[in-house]
Regions:
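Charged, amphipathic alpha-helical linkers/stalks
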Residues: 651-652, 658-729
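Terminal connector regions
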Residues: 623-670
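Glycoside hydrolase catalytic-domain context in secreted enzymes
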Residues: 1-624, 642-647, 651, 756, ...
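Long, low-hydrophobicity ectodomains and other hydrophilic envelope-associated domains
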Residues: 694-818
Length: 818
């Protein structure tokens, strides 16, 4: 098998008919694979669950329109990344694995580790960081925990999936170096260190090739370079050409699309477009996984320890919150002072994002219900503002009066549900204005405001001067309220550090002019300068830098020792409280020949120290510490030079610096600095076509739509349709989308359809619609109504006949593939 060992189930594969082989590579239902009864190959169950299991009790659907079983809602990945604690990630992973086992889930679809290219990505709350090294390390910890319970983790979405707009119909135009260093490194760590047994391919194209059909990605890189020995699963409805996917290295098309894809696979084998050896290899990899996941498995324990998992969620939330500001040490709270609590989020917490990751929690805390458990002098509490933007003048006046009479105001605010969701990117970085208006009015009557933020991604903070303290809870799960009060009262010393940069304004961000995309392409002109790599290199002042976070104590650094294989550094807690520090190691190469960021995170350690305690830490170098991807030679290389090793409390707070000499192995440098001046300065907001073309090494693809709509164009592009009916459908969809936005809650079904390509109609309807029928729909949309209707009607009856015929072939094999 080339880079692989012989399949464990080789004899079983040899007994399968070609119809069974083709059928098993597509799902049976929305969440299950097909079983083959005559060969005792069982079905397995896949479920969403990056921060909690979302297994539906009734008929399954991709977006959770039907209720799911109760599960622990842990803080989202964006929150846990702020803990910088791999042990915590593994502990959460173990709990997720336990709950998956209790619900008979075999593969858990998570964690998500796409890079936060822009703060506007609607799904950033599901992703760890703007930094690939931190993302990969945290993902690997989750994966180890999940898989320790006999469940496969399925990190997603491979790769370059950094936007929701037209995500199923978008082509990411990115150079190979940026692809490798920024967008693949996290997955590489997840595979090599987490030993992930499944990977989900992304919806989008990468340089003109769908991720699920990209042999360079799925075979050359994933399997051969990284040693991946698991299965590749499509995102739901993310299969474009199933035959090409199988040839490239994809094992499982989800969800069920009937037998349409299976027929395509058989035809491709018979006409020579697909090698039967490739088909056998994909089937072998999948059957190996199925048998490993089900062999010797006992009946699951349906009763996981709900209370223990709730307490873990509380611990995780407390360790992941970031104290951004604490003037005059207003925190921890003085229990003698009177406190007013204002804000809708204190009554109805926003603890998770919207979309396929939405969990039905075992219980949810809110601040208003648990205050009696804490020794606080609460003067009163009220909402003060409406979540949907409406104004209740009486409640507003009451909030101001309450604030005027209190010693301290705790103001709970943040992004509402419509601001962050799968299927919908943000259009700005601002918190709803009605919340800020109230905050500013309160600041005029009380200067002692403690802001409690809830948001899954970076926001603009022009109002930060209104607050004496700011505690950012992100989306902190079902136990977030008690975790917040634990920090406010000093029961827990905050130790979260930002896993992403907070710019002053969206216009500062590196991809500001390129995000989200043209009509067909998204151009990654900023190259490797993502997040702090851009701000730090181009000297852009930010609100809060990557890695930043305050504590109730102080830490000093000393005695940096640089060795051949790592560093040693001493850290001392010089305050009067026990606490934890996140020690961050950055590496840079001054006067580099190859352009690169000024510094990059290459190691970190979280250390817990008692008051007055000192400890020496060791942070090792690894194979990623000094490397860069040489596009000229097509390999990882090290540039010869004197590297700067910087150790600090954030990317902007470097405490100790040293140097180390490294002899490189470069076999020719890839760039001409004269042709790429802005890449060498890091000022990448206005990259010209000429410079981007030089970076890519080829012409820039045309990103504009032209001509008739095709099966891979998004349904939201029907504003170009020649059919009046199609344009009417587009207007209706747009109206329904805007209505849900105005109500403050995203309609996930509408959002999914809106951004779905026409081919998705066949991929998401369980076999009721064939690709032939989709071509008829597209003909009708393009103005050929009668031709389209003829194809739709004829295709419908042919699809029914062919499905029945396929079922008979499977039964004729002596059993059933269901």
């Amino acid at each position: 098998m080339g880079w692989k060992t012989v399949m464990k189930q080789q004899k079983l594969i040899e007994k399968m008919t070609i119809e069974e082989k083709a059928a098993i590579l597509s799902g049976k239902t929305v969440w299950q694979t097909r079983e083959i009864d005559r060969l005792s190959i069982p079905s397995i169950f896949l479920s969403d669950g990056p921060h909690g299991i979302r297994k539906q009790a009734g008929a399954g659907d991709h977006l959770g329109l039907n209720a799911s079983l109760n599960a622990t809602c842990f803080p989202t990945a964006a929150t846990i990344a702020n803990s910088w604690n791999q042990d915590l990630g593994e502990e959460i992973g173990q709990a997720l694995g336990e709950e998956a086992v209790s619900m008979d889930v075999n593969i858990l679809l998570g964690p998500g580790l796409n890079i936060k290219r822009s703060p506007l990505c609607g799904r950033n709350f599901e992703y760890f960081s703007e930094d690939p090294y931190l993302s990969g390390k945290m993902a690997a910890s989750y994966i180890r925990g999940i898989q320790s319970k006999g469940v496969y983790a399925c990190p997603k979405h491979l790769a370059v999936n950094s936007q929701e707009l037209r995500r199923m119909a978008m082509d990411a135009v990115v150079d190979e170096r940026t692809l490798r260093e920024i967008y693949l490194t996290g997955f590489e760590i997840a595979v090599k260190e987490g030993h992930a047994k499944a990977i989900m391919s992304s919806y989008n194209q990468i340089n003109g090739i769908y991720a699920n059909e990209d042999k360079h990605l799925l075979t050359d890189i994933l399997r051969k370079e990284w040693g991946f020995d698991g299965i590749v699963v499509t995102d739901w409805g993310g299969s474009n050409d199933h035959v090409k996917g199988v040839a490239a290295g994809s094992n499982l098309e989800m969800p069920s699309c009937g037998y349409d894809s299976a027929r395509e696979v058989i035809a491709a084998v018979r006409n020579g477009k697909l090698k039967e050896a490739d088909l056998d290899e994909r089937v072998g990899e999948l059957v190996d996984a199925v048998m490993e996941l089900t062999s010797g498995k006992k009946l699951s324990d349906k009763n996981f320890d709900r209370n223990a998992h709730h307490q873990l969620a509380r611990k995780a939330a407390a360790e992941s919150m970031v104290l951004l500001k604490n003037e005059k040490q207003i925190l921890p709270l003085d229990t003698k002072k009177s406190i007013a609590i204002i804000g809708d989020f204190a009554f109805s917490p926003r603890y998770q994002g919207a979309g396929s990751s939405m969990v039905n929690p075992t219980k949810v805390e809110d601040m208003s219900s648990i205050l009696q458990q804490y020794d606080l002098n609460i003067l009163g509490m009220t909402r003060g503002y409406q979540r949907n933007g409406d104004v209740d003048e009486n409640d507003r006046k009451f909030a101001l009066n309450l604030s005027m009479n209190a010693d301290i105001v705790i103001f709970c605010f943040g992004l509402d549900e419509i601001s962050e969701s799968e299927g919908l990117d943000r259009t700005h970085m601002r918190i709803p204005q009605n919340q800020i208006d109230l905050l500013q009015d309160i600041s005029k009557v009380n200067e002692n405001i403690i802001g409690i933020l809830s948001a899954g991604s970076a926001i603009e903070m022009p109002w930060h001067t209104c607050c004496k303290a700011i505690l950012h809870g992100y989306l902190n799960g079902q136990a977030g309220a008690s975790a917040t009060l634990d920090i406010l009262t000093g029961k827990v010393n905050p130790s979260g550090r930002l896993a992403e940069t907070y710019p002053i304004s969206y216009e500062q961000t590196p991809a500001f002019r390129y995000y989200p995309s043209n009509e067909k392409t998204s151009e990654y002109r900023e190259s490797v300068y993502v997040g702090y790599r851009y701000y730090d290199t181009s000297k852009v002042r930010v609100q809060y830098p990557f890695g930043f976070g305050l504590s109730y104590t102080e830490f000093t650094y000393s005695d940096l020792i640089i060795e051949e294989d790592g560093i040693k550094v001493s850290v001392t807690n010089t305050g009067d409280r026990d606490g934890a520090e996140v020690v961050q190691m950055y590496v840079g190469l001054p006067n580099a020949i190859v352009f690169r960021p000024e510094k990059e995170l290459k190691g970190f350690a979280k250390v817990y120290l008692k008051a007055g305690e000192s400890r020496q830490l060791r942070i090792p170098f690894d194979d990623k510490t000094f490397r860069y991807w040489n596009i000229k030679t097509g390999q990882w290389e090290i540039e010869t030079g004197t590297y700067q090793i910087m150790v600090g409390a954030s990317v902007a707070d470097i405490r100790l610096t040293g140097m180390t000499e490294r002899t490189g192995n470069s076999k020719g440098y890839p760039y001409n600095p004269a042709k790429m001046p802005y890449y060498y300065t890091g000022i990448v907001q206005k990259i010209s076509d000429e410079e981007f073309r030089e970076l890519l090494g080829h012409d820039i693809p045309n990103g504009r739509w032209s001509g008739n709509l095709e099966i891979n164009d998004a349904i939201c592009q029907m504003y170009y349709a020649k059919s009046r009916l199609a344009r009417l459908i587009y207007r209706c969809l747009t109206k329904m989308k805007k209505k849900s936005e105005a109500q403050g809650k995203p309609d996930l079904n509408i959002l999914f359809i809106y951004n779905m390509p026409f081919r998705g109609i066949a991929k998401m309807t369980g076999g009721a619609v064939s690709m032939e029928m989709v071509y008829g729909i597209v003909d009708a949309v393009n103005g050929h109504f009668m031709l389209g209707v003829k194809k739709i009607i004829g295709g419908y009856f042919r699809n029914r006949r062919n499905n029945k015929k396929y079922e008979k072939l499977l039964k004729g094999a002596g059993g059933k593939c269901r």
